[in-house]
Amino acid sequence: MSAARIYLAAGGTGGHIFPALAVVEALNAKGHETCLFTDKRGANLLAGIADLPVRLYVISAASPFQSGLLRRIIATGKLGLGALSSLWHIGLRRPEVMIGFGGYPSFAPVLIARLLGVPVMVHEQNAYLGRANR
């Protein structure tokens, strides 16, 4: 089996990041190239890991389900910036597959991959699908 370019996208909390990191390690062990999209919270969680086994793309993201019109507008703008950044990275080096692990930072990369015709897989570790994975 030849090595594949596999991108992953995960929210900025441990419940999203650490399952994604486990999949990254398994994919790397099989010789695949991996990249992980997350927000600055996820990057901060991973900052303490020496020899991080994945290329990290930190994108802008926020929940659009906040209270207050101004917060929703700002969150929508952040998601838009995350989508543009995702379009740049995914369009530049088309992955063979994108795996989403939920959380708002995963929404834009997964959506962009889907729009570009990249096959998408979703990993849901909870009993019910979250908003981003739905």
Predicted regions and their residues:
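A short, glycine/small-residue-rich beta-strand->loop->alpha-helix junction that serves as a flexible
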Residues: 8-21
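Short beta->alpha connector loops at strand-helix junctions that form conserved
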Residues: 58-62, 101, 122-126
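Conserved nucleotide-sugar phosphate-binding/catalytic loop shared by glycosyltransferases and other
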Residues: 3-11, 28-78
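Active-site-proximal region of nucleotide-activated glycan assembly enzymes
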Residues: 2, 33, 41, 53-55, ...
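An amphipathic, basic-hydrophobic alpha-helix
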Residues: 65-97, 107, 115
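An aromatic- and histidine-rich active-site surface loop
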Residues: 41-46, 95-116
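Gly/Ala-rich phosphate-binding loop of Rossmann-like dinucleotide-binding domains
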Residues: 24, 28, 114
